[in-house]
């Protein structure tokens, strides 16, 4: 069995990253893909469930996992911890499952260092005006919060060149097709094809 591929995907809030991943998972596809579920110490929100949206644990449990080096990456955001379990990621990859990891550029740097075979994708909006419009249409934040999100978005977008692939989310269906193309291309690269067809290649080259 060939090993799965870890895909890191990052984007500013409001770019449509979650919708894009959900859209991809709903389509019939050649490869088995799952989204990584992070651990967090924040309170569970209405509509969320343990093991589906996050693994909700206490700060004490999270700190123990840090000491045990159980996380590929973790961060503290607004007094709550968020982290990606090394064991769960490695288990899925060894089972031949591709994993999508939705994290910011700082977490992406940690993952690249620890898992250099991972591939990273950055998602950009078609314009600042469109990004602002999408944030407004969500109806979740005040004007002050939206302004702060826009400032943070510019900071995040400055790191796009650190990624392997870049997708502009202007047309939703085209963006999904671009994402599918990236996954297919990675599976067809020499490294993965050689591992997948090692027996066949050995037989073909036997004199």
Swiss-Prot record:
Chief localization: cytoplasm
Please provide, alphabetically and separated by semicolons, the GO molecular function terms listed in this UniProt record.
Answer: ATP binding; guanylate kinase activity
Q: For this UniProt record, give its keywords in alphabetical order, as a comma-separated list.
A: ATP-binding, Cytoplasm, Kinase, Nucleotide-binding, Transferase
- Keyword flag Membrane: no
Question: If you read the UniProt record, what top EC class would you report for this enzyme, in one word?
Answer: transferase
SMART domains recorded = GuKc
- Supply one GO CC term from the record: cytosol
Q: Which domain of life is it from?
A: Bacteria
Q: Does the keyword Nucleotide-binding apply?
A: yes
Q: Which reaction does it catalyse?
A: GMP + ATP = GDP + ADP
Query: Which residue numbers delimit the Guanylate kinase-like domain?
Result: 4-184
Query: Where found, per UniProt?
Result: Cytoplasm
Q: What is its EC number?
A: 2.7.4.8
Record: residues binding ATP: 11-18
- Note one Pfam family from the annotation: Guanylate_kin
Question: Which HAMAP family does the record match to this protein?
Answer: Guanylate_kinase
Family to which the UniProt record says this protein belongs: Belongs to the guanylate kinase family.
Function statement: Essential for recycling GMP and indirectly, cGMP.
Name the chain's protein. Guanylate kinase
């Amino acid at each position: 069995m060939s090993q799965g591929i870890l895909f890191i995907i990052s984007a500013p809030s409001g770019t449509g990253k979650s919708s894009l991943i959900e859209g991809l998972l709903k389509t019939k596809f050649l490869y088995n893909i799952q989204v990584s579920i992070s651990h967090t110490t924040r309170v569970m929100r209405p509509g969320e469930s343990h093991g589906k949206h996050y693994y909700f644990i206490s700060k004490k449990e999270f700190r123990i996992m840090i000491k045990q080096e159980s996380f590929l990456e973790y961060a503290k955001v607004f007094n709550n911890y968020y982290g990606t379990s090394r064991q769960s990621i490695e288990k899925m990859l060894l089972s031949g499952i591709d994993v999508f990891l939705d994290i910011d550029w700082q977490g992406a740097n940690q993952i690249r260092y620890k898992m250099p075979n991972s591939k990273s994708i950055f998602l950009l909006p078609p314009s600042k005006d469109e990004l602002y419009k999408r944030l407004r249409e969500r109806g979740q934040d005040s004007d002050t919060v939206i302004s702060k999100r826009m400032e943070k978005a510019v900071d995040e977008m400055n790191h796009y060149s650190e990624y392997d692939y870049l997708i502009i989310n202007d047309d939703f269906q085209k963006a999904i097709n671009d994402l599918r193309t990236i996954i297919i291309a990675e599976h067809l690269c020499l490294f993965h094809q050689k591992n997948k067809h090692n027996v066949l290649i050995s037989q073909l080259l036997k004199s």
